[in-house]
Amino acid sequence: MRLGAALQAAALLTASLWSHPLLAASDDPAFKTTKLDHYPFNLNYFEDSDIVLYQDEARGTISRSEDAGATWTLVKDIEEGKAFQLVMHPFDRKRAYVLTSPGIHHFRTHDQGRTWQDFLADTEMTMFRLDILSFHATDPDRIIFNGMDCKEGKFFCEEVAMYTTDGFTSDAKFLRGSTSGCSWAKSSKLFTTGQDDLDKNRILCVVRDHFSPLKQDQRLMISDNFFSAKDAGGVIQEFEPNLDMTRPIQGVVNVAVVKKYLLVAASSMNTDEMSLFVSDDTLKWHRAMFPTDHKINQESYTVLESTEYSIQVDVMTTHPSNPMGVMYTSNSNGTFFTRNIEHTNRNHRGHVDFEKITGVQGIFMVNKVDNAEEVEKDRRGKKKIVSEITFDDGRTFEPIHADKERLHLHSVTELINAGRVFSSPAPGLVMGNGNTGKHLESWKDASLYISDDAGLTWIKGPNGPHKYEFGDQGSVLLAVMQAEEVDEVKYSLNHGKDWKTAKLPDDLKVKPIILTTTQDSTSLKFILIGEGKGRDEFHIVAIDFSSMHEATCKDSDMEDWYARVDDKGKATCLMGHTQKYRRRKKDADCFVKQEFKDPVPETKDCECSDQDFECDYNFKRDGKECVLVGTVVAPDGACKNAGPDDTFKGSSGWRLIPGNTCKRASGAQKDDLVDRKCKETSEPTPSEPSGNISTTPHNFSGDWLDFEKHYLEKGAESMDENEVVIARPINAQNAGQIFLTKDHGKTWHMPEALKDKNIWGIVTHQYFKEMAFFVQDTGSVIYTVDHGEHFHDFKAPGNGIDPDTKPLVFHPDHKDWMIWIGKKCEENTCYREASFSQDRGDNWKSIARYVYKCEFTGSSSYKFRSQDQIICSIQSREGNEKNIPFDLVSSNDLFKTSEVRQKNIKDFATMAEFIVVAAEDPERKSLKAFASLDGDSYAATRFPSNLDVKEERAFTILDSSTHAVKLFVPSPAQKDRCVGSIAKSNSNGTDYVVSITGVNCDENYFVDFEKMLTLEGVILVNIVANRENTNEPKKRRSLISHSDGATWSYLPPPRVDAEGKNYPCTSSDNGDENCALHIHGYTERKDHGKTYSSAGAVGLMFGVGNVGSTLGDIKDADTFLTTDAGISWKSVKKGAWRWAYGDQGSILMLVPSTKTKMVSYTTDEGETWNDHNFTDEPVDVLDMTTVSSGGSRNFLLWCRRSDKTVFAVNLDLTGLANTACKQVDDNDSESDYYAWSPSHPLRPDDCLFGHKSYYLRKKTDRKCYNKHKITPVFKMDVCECTREDFECDYNYELEGVGRNCVLAKGAQPMSREDWCSAHPKESTWYEPSGFRRIPISTCKEGRVFDNYTTSWPCPGHEEEYERQHGGPGGFTIFLIVILCVGAAGAVGVWVHRRWESGGFGQIRLGEQSSSGISFLDPDSPWVRYPVVAVSATVALVGALPLLVGALWRTTKTTVERWGIFGGVGRGTYGSLGLGGGSGARRFTTRDSFARGRSDYAGIDEDEGELLGDDSDEEV
C-alpha cells in the first residue's frame, strides 16, 4: 500500500467527533462519531467483546475498533485492495478470515484482529457459492475452503475443496475435486453422528458427476479420511449414503445443518420438484414426507428457524408474484410433516414472516394473509396481512393485541435492520413496527410497539417506524426513527413504558442504515451506521449508556419471569418442562451490567401428557392415532424362524419426543410395547403378476386426420404416480377440443379452463416439463405449472401473436422467467417486440423492438457466462422496409443494458456451450460463421483448405455435445443432389477439420446424421457413394463412428433375416462396401421427432433398412436392432415397423407401419417377441408414444379407422411384472442388473474415448421392473491412449477410409505463429503431427499422437519455454514431468447425459411426436420449409432441427422440431469433462495437475440447427 494512501486512510478513520465527555451519572448516553467516505460493509462483533471489524469494499481494506465503534484503526497487515470478503469464525470468538480475489493467499487472525497472518489456500475462493469456508463446530482448527481452479482466466473453472486441521497455520491440503460444496458433518454444536471419531473427521461433499455439469446429476459423497486413498491402488475412501432408505439419490443440490438435523435437497430433470432427505446422524436417512396436496419445488420452500426437536418449513403454494405459503412442522426425526398454519405471508425472495422469540421454547410469531382467496383469484390484489402468535409450538395461534385492539407487525419480508426482527436474548422483551386495526397498513403508518412478556401483551411506543435494539439484558431499549434525516435517538429504561430522546452531536443528521450491538444484547454500547448529506458520506455513531447510572442491580431489583403462562398466569409446560428467567424489574433504577453473560433459563419438569408423545418410526399421525405406514421394527432376534402370525412385543406407534424431559406417572404409558405380528416386520409378498397386457381405448368424436399431443413429464425422484398427456385431434384446417389424461390415456377429460377456447398453439416448457402454455392468437395465455392440476392465465403484451415466430422463450433455471415475442402495432405500423417477465406473465418489461428472435443464453451450466444473459437478433434500425440488416445484441443484466456484438447477421444458434452466428460477408456474397463461448466475444471460424466455403449460403449445426461444434457444410449442388461435409471444431469453436465428406442431405439442408442417445461419440451418417456421378440417382451407404467422427466404418450386416433366411451377400464381420447394413436416415423421416435410440435404454437402437451394397427403397426395408451400440445388428421384423422403448429398455414395443390390429413386444432385448391385439380390425396407427425417458410401462397408440374416426389406445404392461428390480453390488447372482460396457470395433479392450464405462442394464431373464431410474454410469476405468483417442488436426484429413491423417491437398499445416496467436497463454508449440486429441478422451499415457514431435517456444514465451524445456536441472525436470502429466491427464471427458431427454443431435428422435394445426398445415411455410428468409441474395434459415434441446427434453411436435415453440437455439445442459485440446493445461495453482480437476465448466447440449438460405420468404 502506498504510504500516502495509508496516511490518508488512517487520518480519515481517526477523525471523530466527541459530543459529550464521559461524566459520572450522566443523564444521556455518550456519542462518538466517525466519518467515512465509503459504506462500512459487513460490520461484525467478535462474540463477547467490544471488538468490531468492518470492510471497505471500495478500498479493499479492513478496519478494527476495540471500544465498540468509538475509535477505528486500519488493519495494516492486509495490503490495500486485497480484502474481498470478511468471514467471522462462528465457533471461536477470537478468529476471523479475510479472503482475497483474485488470489490464492488469504488472511487469518487468532487474536480478535490484533494481528493478521496470510495463509496459502492454493486455490481461489469459489465464485459459485456464498459459503466459502465451512467450520467444524467443536474443533476451530478444522476448516474446509471451497475454492475453484480456472483455465484461461475465469473462462473454464471447476470447484475444488481444500482443508486444514491446524487453522491454516500450514498450507491448506487438497480435499477433493469436482465438488459443488463441502462441509463438516459436525457443522452444528447440536448435531452429532453419535460417534466421536466420526464427529471429528466426517465430511460431506456434493460432488459433480464426472460426465455432467447438471445439478440433477450431482451426488452426495461422505469420507472419514479427507477423501484420501485407503490403499496402494489409489481408491479414494468415500461412500454414497442411501438417502432414500435403501438407495442413493442423484441430483443433490444443497446440504444444510439445521440445529440437530442434516438436510439434503435433491432435484430431478424435467421438473423443479424437489426431494428433501433428513438425517440426525448421517447414518440413517429418511425422505421428508409432506401431505400429498403440497409438493416441494425449487425456489418455493424455506427452511425456517427450527427447534431442537423438529424442523419447520414454509412451502409456497401460490403464484410467485404475490406469494403465500403453508407452514409445516416435522416430527422429531424430520420424517413426517404436518400442517401448522396456511396462507403465511412470503415475498418473492423466499422470505417468510416468521420469527421465534429468542430464548423461549414454543413461542413464535407469523403473519398470514387474511384475504387469501381474493389474492389467489386476483394476483394483483392487495394482501390484507394480519399477525398471530403461538405459545404452544404452533398447535394453536391467536391474535396479538395492544390496548384491546388487534395489533399487526411488519416482519421478515420487510427487513430494515441487521439481525433478528422482533426479539433478542433479553428475556421476554420483544419490539416491532406495526399498527392496530383490521390488518397491517403501509410501513410509513407504522409505530413502535413493545412487549415484555414474550408477546402476550403489547404497549405502544414512539410514533413512526423505527430501527431498534436491546441492551443490558433488556434494561435499555434503543430506537432511531427510520427517516431521511434523523438527529436524535430514543431510549427507554423501563421496558418501553417511558421514552427519552438524546441528540446526535454537532447537529449531525443521518439516514439510519443499521443499528446494532453485541450478539447477546448484554452490552450498554450500540453502533448506528447512517448515511450523511453529502455524496459518499457515511457515519459510524458509537452510543454508550455505561455512564448513565452508577448503580448495579441487586437481587431485590430482580424478578422471576416465566416464559409461558396460561390465561390465569400459571406457568405452562412444553417439551416436558416449564421455563423461568431471572431478569431486572421493569422500574428498577439500575443496570444489570453483566456484559457478555447470556441469560440462562431455569426449568422444572412436568408430568407427561399426550403432547409429550409423537408417532414412532414408520408411523404417521391420523387424527388422534398413529397408523403404520411401513414395517414395524422388530427387536434383534424377534421373529427369527417364526411364522407370520407369531407375535412379539413391539411399538405401540407412539414414542416420547426425543429431548422431552417430562416425568412419567405410574400406570400404563402411551408408548408401552404391544403385541405385534411378525408379518408386520416385512413388506407384504406381492402376488404373482397376471402376465397380461391391459388395453384401454378412447374415442375422439368427429372426423380428424391426426393428433397433437404433449407429455407433461415428472422428475425421476417424484413420488407422483401420474403420467399426464395433453392431446387434441386435428386436421388440415382446425383443431378439436383439448383433452387431458393423468393415467397415460386410460381416462380422458376436457379441462374446464380450456373448454371451447380458441387455442392457437400449445407450448410446453422445455426445461420444466410439468408446465404447459395454451396460447390464443389474441395474446391471452392459459397455463398450468402442475401437470394440469390447476390452470392460470395472463395477457401477453402487445397486440397478439406473430404467426411467423415462436411466442415464448424460457429460461433453463428459472421457471417463471419468460420472453414473449409478439406483434406490437402503433398507428399504421406493426413490428415484433420482445418483452421479459420474471413472474410468469404477471408483469412485463419491453426489452427489444423490431426483433427477430431472442434466447436466454445464461444458465447454471455456463459458469463462464452471466446467468442473466439474453441474446437477440434486432434490426439495425427501426422500420418495415425490406432488407434492413440485423445486429446480434446481447445483455448480461436482463436488458437493463445491452451491446451490439455482431453486425449484419443472418441468424444465430446455440449448441452445447457454443453460440454460433452466421453473418453476411458482403465481399464474397456468402455467409461467414462466428463462434463464442461467453456470449460477449465472437471469433471468426477457420475452415481447412480442403473444405470449400467461398460461396457458402447455408450451414447446418449438428449435435455439438463433445466440446466441439459439428457443422454440416453443403457442397455446390444440383437439384436432388445435395451432399456436403461434416466439419468438427476445436474446443473454442473456431478451427475446423473435416470429419467426413459426401454426407447426404436434402434440399432444405437437413442431414442424415444421428447421435446415439446416452452414449458418447457414437454417430451414424449416410453418405452418397456415387456423388461424382451427378446424372445417377443417389446411392447411399450408412457409416458409423465410435470415436465422435474421428474414424468411420460400415455397419456390420446380420447373417440372417427375421425369418432365419440368409442374406444374399456376405462380408467381413465389420461390413464393407459390397455388403453392409444400411439404415434410412433423417431426410426420409416423416416425423422428424423420432429417434433411433432412447435416453433410458443405453446401448439399444432400432433402424429400418436393408443389407446390401447400398441403401434400397424403404418399401423393401426391414427392421433391425442393436443391443451393443452398433457393434452388431440383428433383423427383428420383416418390413418397416415403428418402435418405442419402455421400462428403461427392458420393454421394446413395435407396431407395423401398415394397417394393423396388433403390436409386438419383447422383454429380453429382442431374443423373443410376443404379439398382442389391441383392436378387432386393422387400423392406421398414426403414432406410438410413451414418456421421453423410456421409463414407463404404458404406451399410447394413436389410431385412425377407415371411416376417418380417430381413437387412442393405452397399452398397460405393468401386469408383466410386479416386483421391483434390486441392485446388489457385492453379489452378482442376486442382483437383477449386470454391468454392460460399450466397446470400439477397432479396439479389443472395450475402451471408448480413453476410458471403459460400465452401465447398469436389467438382466433379460429377470421378471421384475425398474422402479427407480437406473444409475447412468455405474463405474469407469481409465485406459491408455491409442490411435482411437485422436483425430485429424487442422488442414489434415483421413487417407481414404483409413486411420492415417495426411495433409490435405494444397494445404499447409498451421504455422507456429498462427497456433501461438490462437493460444496466447501457451508457451510451447509442437511441430504438427497431423493428429489432435479428441476433446472428450480421458486416456492417459500409452501412444500419444499429438505432441511427440519437436517443440518450439511461442514468441514472447521464450523464458518460460526454457524453464520447461531447458537443461537437466532438477527443478526443470520436475516442471517437464508436471507439464507432461498435466497434458496427458487434464483432458476432457464428455459423456452425454440424456436420461430425461427426447433427443440429441441434429436428428431428434423421441418417443412421442405431434402434429399441429394451421401452422402445421403441410401447405404452411412452417412445414414446407422450416426456415426464415432474410434477404433475396444471402439468407439464413432460422429455425430448424433444433428443437427444445437435448438432455431432459422430449420430442414434442413437429412444430417444436422446427423450433416454432420452446427454444430454437437454446439447449439444455450437457456434461462436464476433464478438459481438452492438445496443449498442456495451464492451471491456476502449482499442484492442480495432481487433483484430477476438470477443465470445463457448464456445458450445454442441444440439437441440430440449420443456418442457411431461402429465397421464398421475406422478413
UniProtKB/Swiss-Prot annotation:
Residues 673-698, 1494-1515 are annotated as: Disordered. The keyword DNA-binding does not apply. One of its GO terms (cellular component) is cytosol. Residues 25-1370, 1448-1515 are lumenal. It holds the Pfam family Sortilin-Vps10. One of its GO terms (biological process) is Golgi to vacuole transport. The keyword Transmembrane helix applies. It comes from the Eukaryota. InterPro entries: Sortilin_C, Sortilin_N, VPS10, VPS10-sortilin, WD40/YVTN_repeat-like_dom_sf. Functions as a sorting receptor in the Golgi compartment required for the intracellular sorting and delivery of soluble vacuolar proteins, like carboxypeptidase Y (CPY) and proteinase A. Executes multiple rounds of sorting by cycling between the late Golgi and a prevacuolar endosome-like compartment. This is Vacuolar protein sorting/targeting protein 10. It comes from Pyricularia oryzae (strain 70-15 / ATCC MYA-4617 / FGSC 8958) (Rice blast fungus). The gene is VPS10.
